[in-house]
Amino acid sequence: MSLDQTVDQVLRWAFKSEPLGHAVHFANAYTIALASQDADYAEAINSGDLVCCDGTPVVWAGKWLPDPHGSEWQRVYGPDVMTAVLEKSTARHKHYLLGSTTDTLNLLRNKILQNYPNAKVVGMDSPPFRNATEQELSERNERIADSGANIVWVGLGTPKQDFEVERLKACLPVTALAVGAAFDFLAGTVPQAPPWMQKSGTEWLYRWSKEPKRLTKRYLWGNPTFVKLVVQQRLADRRKATQN
């Protein structure tokens, strides 16, 4: 799906009167590398109602590997989706912000009110870094339900945010999106890479230079693991084609 198609789908889901919600994931090199070694995480991603190509290298890999379905690989970047959904929101779209710090959430809410006047933020929650207890999760569900939200933006970091959007869709009639760093980018607390770096697949270098402590493991382990997985899949596809 293209960016526009993804945005339209999210906006439509918000109005569906169904008992269960929808989950949207954004797959990048680290996501795929992590899923290859964590079966529970892989199941969470695969259970998503929509999984978008968040990273340019993922798009390249999709185009390089044989695809019997003839898919059209496009980058659908989490921050771009969040921005576009906010821009196209009406009074009926009610947004809830889950994740990050209280300061960042306050900045983000103010930016949304300033830049997207039609987007209504009905609640926000900055949970503790540790895993939430069952009681805390139940109380979180109640807060979201009481707010009337139909779109929940989740920025808890990978992999926690992907598990959370799956949990939310099973509990509430909301569309939950695991958008990660979009909170920081839109709030202005972390600078975003220039467009040319995003298109060239070098955005990770920019982000690493800005947050080396947090992102070193992600890139030093995740990127090589992703490349290894792609090459292994390519070789396996070639062997299969030769045998046939």
Describe the residue ranges of each PLM region.
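Short gly/pro/ser/thr-enriched loop/turn and capping motifs at secondary-structure boundaries
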Residues: 58-60, 160, 182-187
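N-terminal nucleotide/polyanion-binding subdomain common to many enzyme families
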Residues: 1-76
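A short, gly/pro- and small-residue-rich
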Residues: 39, 43-47, 162-181
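Conserved acidic residues
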Residues: 49, 122, 150, 174
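Proline-aspartate-enriched helix->loop->beta-strand connector
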Residues: 144, 148-158
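A transmembrane-helix-recognition feature enriched in membrane-embedded lipid enzymes
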Residues: 59-60, 193-244
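Conserved beta-alpha
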Residues: 62-139, 147
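Short, flexible loop segments at boundaries between secondary-structure elements
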Residues: 126-133, 174-210
